[in-house]
Amino acid sequence: MNDHQTITGIYPGTFDPVTFGHLDIVERACNIVDKLIISAAENIHKKPFFTIDERVSMIKESLKLINTNKCLSEVVGFDNLLVDHAKRFNAKVIIRGLRAVADFEYEFQMAGMNSKLAPDVETIFLMASENLQLTSARFVKEIAFHSG
């Protein structure tokens, strides 16, 4: 008798653009969850270079570069509260990537608020792989903008 319950995780981000750092987190998250919903956020506090539809398309295309065979994955956009988005997919886990201590303060506060709003949804932090700790979408955009 198999009583394994499917674990669904949400990996939210702006993904403007998606980077190898993001893909590293996706690949590693697939070792933890059975299904991963990669969710491009429409964030009113950020002014993304790419539209949400472009970001969703880029993520889907980028997933071809990595092994996601360990879990089912789906790519969607969202513009509501993360915990409401997680509930929509019956996700029990929010996956967040951390590059450095500077990321932790913000992520810690967000995880605390999400826990208050949805106590049954856990946040899991994955540290960036050592070779990707300096990768950031902001730097990628800046280099591309200056034809680097």
Predicted regions and their residues:
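Nucleotidyltransferase catalytic core that binds NTPs
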Residues: 1-148
